[in-house]
């Protein structure tokens, strides 16, 4: 319920140009989901790219590190046997998923508490 309340306050201009599926109100929701998942109350984190400034910089991927792409955000939860990182995120195929994911294109790795 809390996540739905955040959806209504995101300006439409922020949602433009997002290549992932949009939720019920036409809003990209990966940032909203991660905010809820991590217990964050900052509306600015609804936009994936804004996670690039949250917390502290991490030197690279690792379990518990937030990975930020230009239009997506998720948290690394493990590493597959082949070395690919496992990422938990919302709005991954319009669903919440935990799966191996390429980190190509990541613009920031962040420690977020």
Predicted features and spans:
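...with weaker cross-activation on analogous glycine-rich loops/strands in unrelated enzymes
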Residues: 43-95
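Catalytic cysteine-centered active-site loop
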Residues: 16-63
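Sec/Tat-exported extracytoplasmic proteins
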Residues: 37-42, 71, 110-113
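Sec-dependent N-terminal signal peptides
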Residues: 1-3
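C-terminal segment of classical bacterial N-terminal signal peptides
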Residues: 5-13
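Aromatic- and glycine-rich peptidoglycan recognition patches
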Residues: 14-22, 79-113
């Amino acid at each position: 319920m809390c996540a739905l309340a955040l959806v209504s306050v995101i300006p439409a201009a922020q949602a433009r140009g997002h290549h992932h599926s949009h939720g019920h109100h036409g809003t990209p929701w990966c940032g909203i989901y991660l905010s809820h998942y991590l217990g964050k109350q900052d509306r600015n984190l609804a936009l994936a790219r804004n996670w690039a400034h949250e917390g502290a910089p991490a030197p690279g991927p690792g379990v518990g590190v937030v990975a930020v792409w230009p239009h997506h955000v998720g948290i690394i939860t493990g590493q597959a046997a082949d070395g690919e990182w496992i990422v938990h995120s919302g709005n991954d195929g319009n669903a919440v998923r935990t799966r191996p994911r390429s980190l190509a294109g990541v613009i920031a790795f962040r420690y977020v508490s």
